[in-house]
């Protein structure tokens, strides 16, 4: 999970999720794309 100031979708499989005021990008197929904002 990378922590970034700005998160972007890197592939069509990425899903944007908001949890507890934080933005996450989750990808089940390619877990290296997982990101968190903040």
From Swiss-Prot:
Q: Name one GO molecular function term.
A: structural constituent of ribosome
Q: Which SUPFAM superfamilies match?
A: Ribosomal protein L36 (SSF57840)
**A Pfam family:** Ribosomal_L36
Q: Which GO terms describe its biological process?
A: translation
PROSITE patterns given in the database record: RIBOSOMAL_L36 (PS00828)
Keyword Nucleotide-binding annotated: no
Q: Which GO terms describe its cellular component?
A: ribonucleoprotein complex; ribosome
Cystine pairs annotated here are none
Q: Does the keyword Ribosomal protein apply?
A: yes
Assigned keywords, A-Z = Ribonucleoprotein, Ribosomal protein
Similarity-based family: Belongs to the bacterial ribosomal protein bL36 family.
User: Which NCBIfam families does the record associate with it?
Assistant: rpmJ_bact (TIGR01022)
The name on file for this protein is Large ribosomal subunit protein bL36
Species name = Phytoplasma mali (strain AT)
The uppermost taxa in this organism's lineage are:
Bacteria, Bacillati, Mycoplasmatota, Mollicutes, Acholeplasmatales
Gene encoding this polypeptide? rpmJ
């Amino acid at each position: 999970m990378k922590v970034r100031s700005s998160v972007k979708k890197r592939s069509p499989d990425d899903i944007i999720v908001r949890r507890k005021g934080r933005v996450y990008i989750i990808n089940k197929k390619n877990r290296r794309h997982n990101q968190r904002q903040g």
